[in-house]
């Protein structure tokens, strides 16, 4: 991550062991069920080649069909049950850490802010997705 770039951090504690959290975070059949910031959005398709140099794409769309985009990038670091670093298509960096704490897993994401939307909006959106992830893991 670049020192001059604004870094946003979001995190949650999931009431599940790290191996379950890792699977639900990385397998496309789970990603499509939690990867949305609000109930009026969804991810109808996800692809994930989880290895350094591997690519991922999640198709994110408004349920009413009014807007959609591909959230995609390339993995830089993959340390099973510990860390995932990737570079987005616009060259921003993202770092994700998984830390098991007494049967729970602390999941922390740090990402470089983009220039278009306010920092608060970006943080709120990414946190909402992480909150959906927590709920999905804990109820499945």
Where in this protein do the model-derived segments appear?
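Glycine-rich portal/gate segments that line the openings of hydrophobic small-molecule binding cavities
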Residues: 42-85
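Beta-strand/loop substructures that line and gate deep hydrophobic ligand-binding cavities in soluble
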Residues: 83-128, 133
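Hydrophobic ligand-binding cavity/cleft-lining segments
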Residues: 1-41
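Generic structural detector for well-ordered beta-strands
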Residues: 9-15, 49, 59, 74, ...
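Short, highly charged C-terminal tails/helix-capping segments
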Residues: 136-140
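Hydrophobic pocket/interface hotspot
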Residues: 21-22, 31, 56-58, 75, ...
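Short, surface-exposed coil-to-beta transition loops
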Residues: 7-9, 68-72, 91-95
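A short, structured loop/turn motif at beta-sheet edges
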Residues: 18-19, 50-51, 76-81, 97-106
